[in-house]
C-alpha cells in the first residue's frame, strides 16, 4: 500500500485490530450511510442506495419470473388486527412502535407501525379469496419496516429498514411447501450468483423459527470475522394465520376450506453481508453484478495535454456506457492518485486509466479491485476484455468466499470442543443434536452459539453435542455465533 493510500484510508481501523470499528469506518468513509437524528435509524446515502437498487433489480426480476406481482400495503396496522394472532404478537411485542395520537387527538385505537405484514395481508386475503379459482395469490411488496431495536448497527440491525416481503395463499399444503422452498432457492440463487456470497440452506429449529410458522427455511452466510448472518428466510405458515383471519375458499368438492400460506423476505441487511464477506482493510469490494459502477474511468491529465485527454476520455466513455455501468471521474479538484484511492475504497470492480502515453499507444490501463492486477489493453480489444474481466471477477469473488467458508467450517464432537473452536477460530461448526430444545439452549448458554441451519439432507446418527445421547435420528446441524 502506498503512503498516499495509507493516509487516505487512515480512518479505517484494520479488521484485525477491531472488526466492529472497521465495519463502521467503512460504511461511513465510503458514504454508504450516515446516522440519523432518530436513535437506531440510518440515512442510506446515494451510493449505499445505488447498491440496494442493483440488488433490488436482480431480486425483483427473479420474484416476477416466478409468477409474483408487486403491491403495496399500509404502514399502519390496527392494534386489534395485530392482537388476533397471540404467538405472532408475542414474538414482535418488544419491538413494535405504536401511534396513539393523530394530530392533537388521541386515537380511538392504537396503530402499530409495520413490524411485518402477515396480519394486514391476512385481513385483505380474507376478503379477496372466496373460491379455489382465486388461488394461488402470489404478492410481494417492497417496503420499510420498523422494529424498535435496543442495540443497533447500520444495515445489520436498525429500528427502520428496507425489505421485500412476499405473502402467498395456496389451495393445498403441498403447494405452500413448494412455494416456500422455491423462494428459498430464489434467495440462494440471488445471493450466490449476484452477490457472490455462498450460503448454507435448510431449516431453522423450532426455537429459532418465525413466530406462527409451521416451518422456517433459511439461508445462512459466514462473515469474514467468522460469525454467521441470516441472509434470508422463507416460512411455510401452514393454516395458522388462515384460521386466525378466516381466510377460506370454496374448493372444487364444494367444501369450504382454509388456505395454506407462506411468507418470505430479505432486507438491506444483505448490504451488511456484502461489506463483511468481501471487504478488506482498504474498504469495499463489490461484485460486478451489484456494483453501481462496474468500471470507473480516471483520466491522467498533465496541463499541456489536458484537453486532449479529456476529449479522448469522453469519446471512450460514450463507447462504453451502453455496454457497462461506467463512471467517468473528470473532477478537477482531485488528483488522479486521490481518485484511485477513493474508488478503490468504494469497491468499484475495475479502474480504467487513460493518459497521453496511453493515447499514443492506442491503449488503456485496467486495474482489478479484487486482485490489484494491472494490465495494458489495446483499445480495439477493450470491450471484449472488460466483458471477460467482469465475468472473471464475479466468479473469483464467489470462489474466494466459498474457499473461506470451507476453510472455516469445523466439526465438534463435544461441548468443550465446540467452545474451544468458537474461541480460537469461530466459523460454522457441524455437530450432532438430539432435537431437544433444552440441549439447544445449553449450547447457547455455554458458548453463545445458536443453531444456524439444519441442512435438508443432514447426516444422522451421532451423539448429541450437549447431552451425549446417541440416536439414529440425531441430526448434524450448523452452530455458530451470529449477528
UniProtKB/Swiss-Prot annotation:
Say if the entry is tagged with keyword Ligase: yes
In its UniProt record, a GO molecular function of this protein is: transferase activity
Q: Superkingdom of the source?
A: Bacteria
**Sorted alphabetically, which keywords does the UniProt record give?**
Aminoacyl-tRNA synthetase, ATP-binding, Cytoplasm, Ligase, Nucleotide-binding, Protein biosynthesis
Q: Which GO terms describe its biological process?
A: prolyl-tRNA aminoacylation
Tell me where it resides: Cytoplasm
Q: What does this protein do?
A: Catalyzes the attachment of proline to tRNA(Pro) in a two-step reaction: proline is first activated by ATP to form Pro-AMP and then transferred to the acceptor end of tRNA(Pro).
Q: Assembly state and interactors? A: Homodimer.
Q: What is this protein called?
A: Proline--tRNA ligase
The species this protein was found in: Natranaerobius thermophilus (strain ATCC BAA-1301 / DSM 18059 / JW/NM-WN-LF)
